[in-house]
Amino acid sequence: MGKLVALVLLGVGLSLVGEMFLAFRERVNASREVEPVEPENCHLIEELESGSEDIDILPSGLAFISSGLKYPGMPNFAPDEPGKIFLMDLNEQNPRAQALEISGGFDKELFNPHGISIFIDKDNTVYLYVVNHPHMKSTVEIFKFEEQQRSLVYLKTIKHELLKSVNDIVVLGPEQFYATRDHYFTNSLLSFFEMILDLRWTYVLFYSPREVKVVAKGFCSANGITVSADQKYVYVADVAAKNIHIMEKHDNWDLTQLKVIQLGTLVDNLTVDPATGDILAGCHPNPMKLLNYNPEDPPGSEVLRIQNVLSEKPRVSTVYANNGSVLQGTSVASVYHGKILIGTVFHKTLYCEL
C-alpha cells in the first residue's frame, strides 16, 4: 500500500512539474520567431568570437567589452579559455577590438567576466568595475584604466554575503554601485525550478563601504541595470518577466518603482543613448533555443529602443532583429554618435552605422 501511495504522489508531482514547465514555456514565448530588421551598414568584429555579454562606452568613444562568459546552462565556444576585457575605439573608421592586458597581481586564469560598468572620477581617472564569477561564485573586481598603455591595473576585489548570483552593476560613485541578483538559488537545478515556479525572489542591492542593503525586490530574474543620464532614475530589466522597471533613486540610495514597461521579449542588458536618453535593450526572442542550443536552429537576436521612458506611453521600436543566421543570443546594445555595438552572451559582436 505504501508503495502505491508513493507512486501516486510521484505521478501527481511529475504531472504538476510538467504543467508548470508548459506554463513557463508559454510565459517566456518559447516558440517566438522574429521578423528581420537589419541596418545596411553592419559587419561582425573579427576579434570577438566568444561573446560580448556587456558593453560600456566612455564619452570619448572607447568601448569596453566583457567576453568569454561561462554561465550555467549557456553555450560556450571556448570553455578552456579565461575571459577577457576588450577595447574598441569607435572614432576609428574601421574599429577593431583588442584584448586589454591586466596587471597588478590579478588571477587572469579565473577571470569569468559578466556585467561591467565604467566610473570616471573627479580627476578624470577611469575605473572599470566587472562582475566576475571565479569558480561560479560572484565578486566585483575594480580596475584602473591606463589609456596610454591600453591596459587595466587590478586594484581590488569586493565580496559580500549579499553579492550572490550577481548579473550586472551600475557604478555611481567610488565603490558605490547597484547590483542585480538574477537567481535566488546558486544551485543550477534549483535555480531552474525557481524560474519555472516564478518565485520572484531576486533583487537589486546597493553596495558601499559603509552600507550594503537590498533596495528593490520581487523580480523573477533581475538582470541588466543602468541609470538615466541625469542619474535620477534607475532602470532594471527583469528578463523572465519580459519587462523593464523604472525606479526613482533617492538621496539615501533607496529605490521606488514608478512604472513597469512590458516588452513581450526577454530583456537582458540595458544601456542609455547619451544623445537622447532612450533605453536600448538587448533581448532574447526565443530563450528555449538559447537553453537547448542547436547550431542548426540557433537562438535569434533582438535590440529594442524605448523612447519617452517616463511618459504614459513610451514608444518601443526594433533597432535590430535576426533569426540567428548572423547573430545569436543578443545580450546588449550600446550606441555612440550614430554607431551601435551589439553584443551576445556567447556568440559574435556586430558593429553597425545607423
Curated annotation (Swiss-Prot):
Superkingdom classification of source: Eukaryota
Modified residues (Phosphoserine): S165
UniProt KW Glycoprotein keyword: yes
Post-translational modification: The signal sequence is not cleaved.
Compartments reported by the entry: Secreted, Extracellular space
Cofactor(s) of this protein: Ca(2+)
A Gene Ontology cellular-component term: extracellular region
Gene Ontology biological process terms in this record: carboxylic acid catabolic process; establishment of localization in cell; lactone catabolic process; negative regulation of superoxide anion generation; regulation of cellular response to drug; renal sodium ion transport; response to toxic substance
Keywords: Calcium, Disulfide bond, Glycoprotein, Hydrolase, Metal-binding, Phosphoprotein, Secreted, Signal
Cofactor, free-text remark: Binds 2 calcium ions per subunit.
Active-site residues (renumbered): H114 (proton acceptor)
EC number assigned by the record: 3.1.1.2, 3.1.1.81, 3.1.8.1
Family assignment from sequence similarity: Belongs to the paraoxonase family.
Physiological role: Has low activity towards the organophosphate paraxon and aromatic carboxylic acid esters. Rapidly hydrolyzes lactones such as statin prodrugs (e.g. lovastatin). Hydrolyzes aromatic lactones and 5- or 6-member ring lactones with aliphatic substituents but not simple lactones or those with polar substituents.
Subunit-level organization: Homodimer.
Protein name per Swiss-Prot or TrEMBL: Serum paraoxonase/lactonase 3
Organism: Homo sapiens (Human)
Gene: PON3
